[in-house]
Regions:
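Short, cysteine-centered beta-strand-loop-beta hairpins and adjacent loop/turn segments enriched
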Residues: 92-97, 123
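Positively charged n-region of N-terminal signal peptides that target proteins for export
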Residues: 1-4
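Non-cytosolic coordination micro-motifs
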Residues: 20-81, 116-191
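Bacterial N-terminal signal peptides
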Residues: 8-15
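N-terminal post-signal-peptidase region of extra-cytosolic proteins
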Residues: 52, 87-93
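Mid-length scaffold segments of soluble, non-membrane domains
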Residues: 103-120
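Hydrophobic/aromatic beta-strand elements that line small-molecule binding cavities or substrate pockets
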Residues: 101-106, 158-160
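A broad structural signal for short, well-ordered beta-strand segments within beta-sheet-rich domains
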Residues: 74, 98-100, 112-114
Length: 191
């Protein structure tokens, strides 16, 4: 009985204090290991009525890349057989504080799939959060100790995340129907 009480007290302290986020690897180098504390009160949240996006920054989901002008290849992500990201000339996303950030547009098999904005620093992340909450409503917060918010709609999924270690924020919206097509493609390729 004493042992059980000791274990329960230890687990309670561990939950209260948390686990250290840095560990040493076999070379003695410090590596970062994130610890996520679930938000037990979190519920799935949709977009505020009438605000679910059917694209991003004026580009509709599944629009063919060839239909757009001024797109410049930026990078390639190897996920799902390759997602090509582009920047659009003279294009930006306006944060809540008025700062403009570049937008990365992701295309899978030449079809528009996702829009993404990266921020640097807490001030700019908070401005992106302010803009997102104002336009789409407050997102679900799945973790108590992380700045992360999610929205799930009929055909769009949106996320807003901040990494306190790198001071980088990310805001993205992606097409759910395109995600399903991509997952089906990967499943076929594996067969």
């Amino acid at each position: 009985m004493k042992r059980l009480i000791g274990i329960l007290i230890s687990l309670s302290l561990l939950m209260l204090i948390g686990c250290p986020q840095f560990r040493s690897n076999f070379l003695g180098e410090e590596i970062y290991i994130p610890v996520y504390l679930p938000n037990e009160n979190c519920q799935l949240v949709g977009f505020k009525p009438g605000s679910e996006p059917d694209g991003f920054n004026g580009i509709k989901w599944e629009t063919m890349l060839s239909m757009l002008e001024g797109m410049k290849h930026y990078r390639k992500d190897k996920s799902y057989g390759g997602i090509d990201f582009y920047l659009k000339e003279k294009d930006a996303f306006k944060l809540g504080n008025g700062k403009l950030e570049s937008v990365q547009y992701g295309f899978w098999r030449e079809k528009f799939y996702t829009g993404m904005v990266m921020t640097q620093g807490l001030e700019h992340f908070n401005a992106a959060k302010e803009a997102a909450f104002s336009k789409f409503g407050e997102g679900a917060k799945p973790f108590r100790n992380k700045e992360e918010y999610l929205w799930v709609g009929k055909n769009a999924v949106m996320a807003l995340r901040y990494d306190e270690n790198t001071k980088a924020g990310i805001f993205y919206i992606k097409s759910d129907s395109m995600t399903k097509q991509m997952e089906e493609h990967v499943a076929k390729v594996k067969q």
